[in-house]
Amino acid sequence: MHKVLIIDDEKDICFLISEILKDENYNTSIALNSDEAISKFKEIKPDLVILDVWLSNSKLDGIEILKEFKSINSNIPIIIISGHGTVDLAVKSIKNGAY
């Protein structure tokens, strides 16, 4: 079963994405801040990461977490999500290896 790590500071968003993926037989883990995200990334070694770019309760933002993940394992696909996206953010995310 494929493992997906979902990172967002909003529990409801994490739960919604998790339930949709579980219905499709994915194994999901949730992180609500950057410390949790990095710890779970190392622990579960996900096959895919869904990462919110703006984490209000974190030391690191989504781009910084993306860079950290890519330094650990550059082969894991990372999808950046945001409710407040811009073209600059999209370009920055792609340049750092996100989808």
Q: Predicted segments — roles?
A:
Residues 11-29:
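Two-component/phosphorelay signaling modules centered on CheY-like receiver
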